[in-house]
Every structure is written in C-alpha cells, then in structure tokens.
C-alpha cells in the first residue's frame, strides 16, 4: 500500500501534464479577456463554513466531506468546492468596498469522499469563477457566455446548455408547499435520504439520483412555472440575453444543482461523451450566500467545472493538445575536457532563455545521440577535444538530418534566429 496512491487520487505524469498546462493557459487567457482576477484560497477551512454555505442537507456535507479535528480540537474540512472559500475571503478581506462587480477566478484541487468512477475522483481539479455585486441577469449571461467561449476555444463540440430558475426564498416557500403535497402520497417509495429531506428541504429531492426517486419526481410541479414576478422577469432577461448572443439553450426543470446556496438562475453544460452523468460545468446565482456567511447582503453568481471531466470530453472527441516544448539543443560531449566545456555551454544557453540538455550518465556518443532523439531536441552538437581546440563543431538539425559546421561562439545567436 505504501507505493500505491490512495483510492480516488491520481498522479499526473510528465507524459500527460502538457495537456493540463494547455488547459491552464487557456483558463488564464479566458479570465483575463473577461476581466476576472485570480484568487488563491486555503485547502482547508472551518467545517462550519461549508455547513452554512454549501448546506447541511446536501450530499456533500452529509456524506462526502473530509472532516477532522486539528490539534486544537477545531473541526476542519478539506475544501469540497471553491465557492464557500471565495465568499469567506470576499467578506474577510473587505472586498465589498471595491468597485462592483468583483470578478474572481480560481484553479484548485478539491476533495470529496465519492464513489470512484471514470472522471470522478476523491481529489480532483476544479476551475471556477465568482462574481459579486451585480443583481441583474446581464452578469448571468456573461458568466454563461464565458463557459461557451471557453469550450469553443478548446474545440469542444456536442455540448449542450441547460438552464433553469429555482426562484428566491419567497416563491420557493410557496413552491415547497406544492411539492410536499405532491410527494406526500409517495413518501414510502422515496429513498431513506429523501425521506429525511422531505420536511427540511424538499427541493433537494428533485436532485436525487436514485431511480425510484427520479420516477416519482418526473411529474412533480416545476419551480420554473411557479416563480414570483421578480424571478420570472430575471429569467426572461437571461433568456433574452442568451438569444441576443446566439447561444442555444434548453430549459430543464429538473436542474436544481447539488448545493443549497443557489437562487434564481442555475445552469449546466452537458456532454454525451462521458457517460450517464455528463455534466462538465455547472453553476448559478447565490444572492443570499454572502449574508448567510456573515457578510452584507450581496448578489453573486459563479460556475465550476471539473478538469478531469473536461479532459475526458476533449480526449473522447479526439481533440489534439499542443505538445510540450522540446529542447532547443542537445550537447553531446566525449572526454573530461569536452564535458566541462559542455557544462558551461549549457549553462550559458539556459541563461539566454534557450532549452539545452546534455548527458549526465557518462553514455557513449552513439547512446547520447539516441537520447537526444528521444528527447525530441531540435538540434545537436557533438564535442570532443578537436572541436574545443578549433572552436568549431557540426550543428545537426535532428528533424531533417542537415549538418553544418559553425563557430561555437555563434551558437547562441544561431539558435535564436
């Protein structure tokens, strides 16, 4: 067990990490283009933050959090998502005094004790954005368009946008009465978890993944059809904004998202390329969350996407990733004098911003050239006593095989051409 990664975790090896570098670079560019600034939050927070923020009736809080007592007997939890930590930081650091909206993004690892399956891990990578202070549907449209543009830039096809509105506390209270009246005759057929949710948070039953519960809720009254005027107008504004940008969408009355903090707009981007639970990105508005966590009433909206699932979609669709940069040159050296000269030359090349490699294992010249080929070096040079004495060597283009004698003094300028 000592030499095996814990269940639900995965090493990202050098042969794969270039794909992550590409996605991370595209994330940074996207967020820059939309005016979002990066925030870095702690890996762990006080457990109460997630109980209050995520919701103590959610699967995440009830079943999936990694929670422990620290040496001071404080209850600490590894972050299961990013929003609650960003909200805490927004409050603690007085960001309400900044020009609004405050637009933030993060690229983090998160931790949930989930059933491990393809694309779902217990340690996973999550990219998310949060925007605070804008109450109208325009920011909802911007957030959704941001995800759409990101997928377009990555070349992802066959991904659909589903939207819904789950209202505000006012219309949700009225809706909950209707939902409870509908569910009450079927309580015995609901799973044990949903039976506990019936009184505390009946809306959460709509989100249950158990087949028996899904059958019962399939014909339940839809919250989107029971909105108050304010929520209805907000949803109409969202739809009009998406249509104005030419973004296709479908209304899915069953989207409630798995977190209690959502209000009004909720949305998911779904792909058929990763199995039954094909959500790649999800998000929505949370107008009461900042206040619930101890701040002033502040509207907010955000999204999060799992990067493991994003990678699965890209690979399943055959999308090519730009390969990692190969060494500009490999310097092969034979003999102590040549090796010493090569060490200095490699250092000088690296100081100039060039990627240079040399043998560190005492291999033969033939083995060194084979190694240079495996590294994918663009050029190679072989050094021995004769080359050092003359100050000249043969520069070989490893792709074409073309060879040309050059002065060693001009090597840096030639490689920079």
Swiss-Prot record:
Protein keywords: Aminoacyl-tRNA synthetase, ATP-binding, Cytoplasm, Ligase, Nucleotide-binding, Protein biosynthesis
Quaternary context: Homodimer.
Biological-process GO terms, alphabetical: histidyl-tRNA aminoacylation
Cellular component per GO, a single term: cytoplasm
UniProt name for this protein: Histidine--tRNA ligase
Subcellular location: Cytoplasm
This enzyme's EC code(s): 6.1.1.21
Stretches of the chain forming a coiled coil according to its record: none
Keyword Transmembrane among record annotations: no
Gene: hisS
GO-annotated molecular function: ATP binding; catalytic activity, acting on a protein; histidine-tRNA ligase activity; transferase activity
Location (main, coarse): cytoplasm
Similarity field: Belongs to the class-II aminoacyl-tRNA synthetase family.
Catalytic activity, reaction form: tRNA(His) + L-histidine + ATP = L-histidyl-tRNA(His) + AMP + diphosphate + H(+)
Record bears the keyword Translocase: no
